């Protein structure tokens, strides 16, 4: 339980046997260090048989973005404790409001995704709960960095791999601007026109299944952030509320 090498403890019992009290005294003396286990990340697993032993295979190069993102994801998954909570939200009124947007010049309907509203809601939540807008990158010193800016990361699935650009100062932008910037960031990522610095310095990340479907999932926190918001697809359903189905 204490990690003590019992051979280093002087026993006080007959024939040098070590008692529980001897171990406690040894620990209290602080004259030793508990050996830390060596953890090797990405240790190569050896296959007993080659894949080609069972049929035809094709060897492909992994795109650079995917190789880089896999290292970041592995680091996040192994170093950040993950606790996941699933919940549902009624977005009936949000959808009515979102689909009512029209262009003031042409009168045509404006296409604004639900993600723009979620970004705005997240920034309000971060202001109310600032610990979620932080990074714990100095854990040994017992310090955390609480950010005073609101740069929301948006997970973008591209042919090159997963990228997470930051929508800067989201708290100071309206829904129209957020919506247009979301499209701009997505296009820049898919065309590999995004500046490297724009992939860093985030407050919290949003990742959405809206494009591919799926209700619940467990996304990996984007280090050095401390939380991530996973959003499933929206759907119509009947619920029992106030004694009746609605």
Spell out what each predicted region is.
Residues 2-4, 8, 17, 21-25, ...:
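C-terminal catalytic/motor cores of large multi-domain enzyme assemblies
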């Amino acid at each position: 339980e204490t990690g003590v090498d019992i051979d280093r403890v002087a026993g006080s019992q007959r024939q040098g046997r070590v008692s529980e009290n001897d171990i406690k005294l040894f620990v209290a003396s602080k004259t030793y260090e508990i050996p830390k286990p060596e953890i090797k990340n990405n240790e190569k697993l050896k296959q007993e048989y080659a894949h080609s032993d069972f049929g035809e295979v094709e060897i492909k190069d992994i795109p650079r973005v995917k190789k880089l993102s896999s290292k970041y994801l592995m680091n996040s998954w192994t170093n950040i404790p993950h606790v996941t909570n699933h919940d549902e939200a009624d977005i009936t009124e949000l959808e009515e409001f979102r689909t009512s947007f029209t262009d003031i010049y042409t009168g045509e309907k404006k296409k604004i995704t639900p993600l723009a509203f979620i970004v705005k809601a997240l920034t309000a939540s971060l202001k109310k709960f600032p610990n979620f807008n932080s990074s714990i990158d100095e854990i040994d010193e017992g310090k955390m960095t609480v950010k005073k800016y609101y740069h929301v990361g948006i997970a973008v699935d591209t042919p090159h791999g997963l990228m997470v650009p930051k929508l800067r100062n989201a708290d100071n932008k309206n829904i129209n601007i957020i919506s247009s910037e979301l499209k701009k960031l997505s296009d820049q990522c898919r065309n590999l026109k995004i500046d490297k610095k724009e992939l860093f310095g985030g407050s919290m990340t949003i990742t959405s299944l809206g494009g591919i479907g799926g209700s619940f999932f467990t996304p990996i926190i984007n280090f050095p952030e401390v939380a991530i918001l996973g959003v499933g697809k929206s759907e119509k359903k009947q619920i029992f509320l106030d004694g009746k189905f609605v």
